[in-house]
């Protein structure tokens, strides 16, 4: 095992019980966040790649210029498809960015809450231990 891991392990063992629980809870939240964000990144890339590829094919093929210039029903339909594909690509990117921001904000808030609870629990345990020592010391 590496030195940094050994040091982390030693430091963890020296923590109070409540601090250990808080550390583990925060670690779980951050691991969960990483998994969710990673999944969103993959999904966002797939949607953007597919819609971007379709949009690029429509633009590169010149179908809109050839058939769209006719002004007929086919031309209008192809124009609508091209616009829809570009809108979907833009929307997918925006939705992905919003989703990542929401996950990061929720995880950050949850981690802060866990940290606050851990601090409160740690203080409560220390206060109880201090009170116990005071009462036994007075006898």
Swiss-Prot record:
- The answer to whether UniProt assigns keyword DNA damage to this entry is no
Q: Which UniProt keywords apply?
A: Bacteriochlorophyll, Chlorophyll, Chlorosome, Chromophore, Photosynthesis
An annotated GO cellular component? chlorosome
A molecular function (GO) held by this record is: bacteriochlorophyll binding
Compartments where located: Chlorosome
Q: A biological process (GO) annotation for this entry? A: photosynthesis
Q: What is its main location?
A: other
The protein's superkingdom reads Bacteria
What protein does this entry describe?
Answer: Chlorosome protein C
What is the gene name?
csmC
